[in-house]
């Protein structure tokens, strides 16, 4: 199929529709803030529609991927390599954030007295019991019941059950073929539902952006513009610098990858939620040649353990507060901060407002930096969350391709075809290509 025949009119492109919707949302929120804040249900509704479908999609993808594998040892290898990659990249993100905030020093010269700050707004984030310990976090991965995990949309709990189900189905051998076929076909129905939901993505992006600008205003951007600029710059450095090097070492270009997921990036920009494109990212990673089992394990796990954007935010925000309140931090204190963040950032994975919760817990644990300083960045946190979500999204996509490459589960020919031809039907209609390219994977026959 030629590129020309695959092109859609601009007004039918999801990319163009989301750009238009976000622009209108910004204008409405700025000029009619009261009306803009009333658009919040549109954004919330879209995100709820996506969350409705995430758990069953993860289940189907993981089960089909694992049950269809010949070597079960590869599942453990994939998981181990993924966790190793996540830890290394999270550490690099923390270090990059620490380096940039020390070089640019966005908080220097503000001379804020912590005692003069209104801390009422941060009470909800710093209340005792909000932060999970490591043991509590691990126990929370085990659901009280399977139904409860799916009903609440707990990604890690659903993932655990899906892995166990996939192993059991594989062990069942040929007797499980009927179950396997049903789950595989059901997954295609679910992705068709995703396609239907994505048609209203521009409406969701419009509502979320109108609410954000209407509630917080563009003025809050300018009041702490130096921190905002430094943070966005750091995210760009990490994506195109650090992830760029990682991508190049593994045989693909991060620039082409970002172009490939441009629609998903715009939706995340509008909704400030990387979860809003999780199902579509899973489709696109498979379309780039990553094996279903790798996609099913890495993407959902990455949403809890591979939060590169959040890691950058944590070190930058902590040191910014110290700079703004004239609180000196020695090199040893900053290294200690880094070490504590390596632990605490994992404990808050998947928790709403996790950035503030982790930051508050870390500042309390390290000592020296006033927790009250969180009030300084409360007003712009929503705008910073967009950069966090965008960086997290790119990071998880790159992680999937890299881990797939390491385990030998990445079709490099399909990868380069997908990245070099972003306007083909594969990019516009991923599920249609999935139907054509994914062949039936028989459940392994039981061994006598």
Swiss-Prot record:
Record keywords: Cell inner membrane, Cell membrane, Membrane, Symport, Transmembrane, Transmembrane helix, Transport
The UniProt record lists the keyword Cell inner membrane: yes
Cell location: Cell inner membrane
Name of the protein in its database record: C4-dicarboxylate transport protein
Entry keyword Cell inner membrane: yes
Gene that specifies this protein: dctA
GO molecular function term, any single one: malate:proton symporter activity
GO cellular component terms, A-Z: plasma membrane
Superkingdom per UniProt: Bacteria
HAMAP family named in the record: C4_dicarb_transport
Membrane-protein topology: Multi-pass membrane protein
Transmembrane segments: 13-33, 49-69, 81-101, 149-169, 193-213, 227-247, 294-314, 336-356, 357-377
Protein species of origin: Albidiferax ferrireducens (strain ATCC BAA-621 / DSM 15236 / T118)
Coiled-coil boundaries: none
Role of this protein: Responsible for the transport of dicarboxylates such as succinate, fumarate, and malate from the periplasm across the membrane.
Main localisation: membrane
Biological process, per Gene Ontology: L-aspartate transmembrane transport
InterPro entries in UniProt: C4_dicarb_transport (IPR023954), Na-dicarboxylate_symporter (IPR001991), Na-dicarboxylate_symporter_CS (IPR018107), Na:dicarbo_symporter_sf (IPR036458)
Family per record: Belongs to the dicarboxylate/amino acid:cation symporter (DAACS) (TC 2.A.23) family.
């Amino acid at each position: 199929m030629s590129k020309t025949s695959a092109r859609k009119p601009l007004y039918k492109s999801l990319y163009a529709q989301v750009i238009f919707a976000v622009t209108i949302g910004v204008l409405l929120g700025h000029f009619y803030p009261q009306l803009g804040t009333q658009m919040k249900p549109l954004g919330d509704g879209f995100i709820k529609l996506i969350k409705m479908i995430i758990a069953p999609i993860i289940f189907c993808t993981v089960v089909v991927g694992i049950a269809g594998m010949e070597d079960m040892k590869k599942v453990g290898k994939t998981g181990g390599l993924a966790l190793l990659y996540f830890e290394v990249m999270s550490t690099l993100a923390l270090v990059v954030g620490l380096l940039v905030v020390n070089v640019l020093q966005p908080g220097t010269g503000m001379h804020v007295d912590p005692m003069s700050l209104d801390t009422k707004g941060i009470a909800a984030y710093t209340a005792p019991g909000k932060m999970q310990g490591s043991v509590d976090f691990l126990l929370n991965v085990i659901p009280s019941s399977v139904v409860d995990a799916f009903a609440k949309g707990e990604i890690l709990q659903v993932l655990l059950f899906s892995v166990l189900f996939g192993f059991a189905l594989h062990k069942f051998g040929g007797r499980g073929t009927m179950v396997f076929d049903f789950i595989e076909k059901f997954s295609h129905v679910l992705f068709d539902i995703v396609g239907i939901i994505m048609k209203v993505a521009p409406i969701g992006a419009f509502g979320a952006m109108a609410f954000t600008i209407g509630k917080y205003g563009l003025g809050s951007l300018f009041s702490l513009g130096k921190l905002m600029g430094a943070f966005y710059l750091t995210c760009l450095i990490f994506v195109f610098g650090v992830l760029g090097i990682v991508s190049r070492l593994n045989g693909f270009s991060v620039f082409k990858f970002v172009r490939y997921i441009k629609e998903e990036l715009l939706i995340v920009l509008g909704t400030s939620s990387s979860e809003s494109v999780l199902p579509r990212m899973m489709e696109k990673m498979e379309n780039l040649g990553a094996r279903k089992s790798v996609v099913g394990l890495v993407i959902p796990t990455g949403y809890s353990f591979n939060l590169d954007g959040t890691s950058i935010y944590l070190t930058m925000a902590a040191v910014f507060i110290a700079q703004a309140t004239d609180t000196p931090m020695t090199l040893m204190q900053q290294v200690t901060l880094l070490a504590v963040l390596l632990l605490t950032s994992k404990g808050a994975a998947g928790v709403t407002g996790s950035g503030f919760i982790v930051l508050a817990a870390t500042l309390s644990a390290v000592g020296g930096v006033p927790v009250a300083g969180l009030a300084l960045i409360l007003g712009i946190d929503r705008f910073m969350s967009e950069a966090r979500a965008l960086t997290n999204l790119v990071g998880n996509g790159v992680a999937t391709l890299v881990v797939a490459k390491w385990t030998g589960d990445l079709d490099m020919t399909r990868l380069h075809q997908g990245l070099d031809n972003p306007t083909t039907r594969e990019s516009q209609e991923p599920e249609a290509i999935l139907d054509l390219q994914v062949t039936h994977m028989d459940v392994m026959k039981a061994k006598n």
